[in-house]
Amino acid sequence: MKLPKEGDFITIQSYKHDGSLHRTWRDTMVLKTTENALIGVNDHTLVTESDGRRWVTREPAIVYFHKKYWFNIIAMIRDNGVSYYCNLASPYMMDTEALKYIDYDLDVKVFADGEKRLLDVDEYEIHKKEMQYSADMDFILKENVKILVDWINHEKGPFSKAYITIWYKRYLELKNR
């Protein structure tokens, strides 16, 4: 499949382990694609939940997906600084319909002041039993929490101020064409 190009708009679909559609984002603007990663931006993007509820994102957010890591990263650009919402999730795949991944419940939130929180541990434990996550899957996800926290602590990739500056600036250039 041909990779989307800078400035293209794509749909993002999040699924659960049992194959059910969890959430859809319409019209994410692509900023960069490589063989293994995609960087995009959501800005007033329509989001549809599995129960049909719809809402629109409030602020620009740079999104980062990778084919080798079991997480994706959303950097929300707010007046008080950048905060992050990180989903523990399968590496993404693309088809002609959308960028797709499986959401594995665990999330790491990083507030603009640097505080970190691991979220939805109870939901993860419930779904682990209900959807029968394997021991290998559990290990992979927990190891990727460690990798993610290391990235946060060392300001790697999307957690670097320079990264946010570069990609937000590029988004503004593309948006104003």
Swiss-Prot record:
Regions crossing the membrane: none
PANTHER family: PTHR39159, UPF0374 PROTEIN YGAC
Pfam families: DUF402 (PF04167)
InterPro entries for the chain: DUF402 (IPR007295), FomD-like_sf (IPR035930), Ntdp-like (IPR050212), SA1684 (IPR016882)
Source species, domain of life: Bacteria
Keywords, alphabetical: Hydrolase, Magnesium, Metal-binding
Active-site residues annotated for this sequence: 23 (proton donor)
Protein name, per record: Nucleoside triphosphate/diphosphate phosphatase
GO molecular function, one term: magnesium ion binding
